[in-house]
């Protein structure tokens, strides 16, 4: 029965970092810590990686 606890703990530790990379950026602080800017429409050299709290203000990062 202890092997179940060990397996559960191992899977929890193994899969927990993946959740951080799948979250959507939805505030200005997270956008800026990822090296991006909050802007209306993204310029051509940038790509959208999220939004900055409002659907019209996008989080744009250079390609």
From Swiss-Prot:
Disulfide bonds join 31-59, 38-52, 42-60. Keywords: Antibiotic, Antimicrobial, Defensin, Disulfide bond, Pyrrolidone carboxylic acid, Secreted, Signal. It holds the Pfam family Defensin_beta. GO terms for cellular component: extracellular space. Residues 1-22 form the signal peptide. One of its GO terms (biological process) is chemotaxis. Tongue, esophagus and trachea. Belongs to the beta-defensin family. This is Beta-defensin 4. It comes from Mus musculus. The gene is Defb4.
